[in-house]
Amino acid sequence: MMIQSVHAKRLEFDNVILDLSHLQLHGPPEERYIVFLNVKRAFYKNFCVECDMSLETFALHLYETARLTVDGAVVPRAPEFAHHISFNSADRDQSLVLDLGPDARIVVAKQLRADERYHQRASGFLDFQRRHERPPAPIEHDLVARNALDRELEIKLYTLCES
C-alpha cells in the first residue's frame, strides 16, 4: 500500500463532504489505481493506491467505505450498489464511476503507467480523460496557467451543476 496524504482523500465544498481518509487496504500491492474524488461535478482531488484487489472489487470497497456528508447529515449507501457503479466506456473500460449521490462521485481507474499522476483539480481530471490519446495530449506545466484553467473549469462546471 502506498502512503498518501489524508488531505488528498477528503474533498469538501458547499456543505458536501466526500471522505476516504479512513480507507484501509491490506495485502500485497499487486494492482495500481488512481482514485478521483468529485464534488458538485466541478471539484476534484485524486490519489494513487496499490492493493491486491481487482478493479471491480476495489470499486465496491470504495463504494462501501466512502463517507458522504451533505448539510451535516451522513448519506447512507444504497444497498443495490450495482445500480450506482458503472464502467467508464470513455476510458476504454479501464475505470469505474461510483455515483454516490447527485453531488458526489468517485472514479477509480487502473493506472496504465507507473508514472501516471494527475494535478489535483479539475484540469487534472481533464488530463485523465485524455490519457488514451496518441500522441499524448499536451499537459500544462505552468502553475499560473493551470490555476487559471482550474478556476475557469470549476466555475463553469459548478454553474452547470447548479442550474
UniProtKB/Swiss-Prot annotation:
Question: Pfam families, per this entry?
Answer: DUF918
| Protein name, per record | Uncharacterized 18.9 kDa protein
The record lists the organism as Orgyia pseudotsugata multicapsid polyhedrosis virus (OpMNPV)
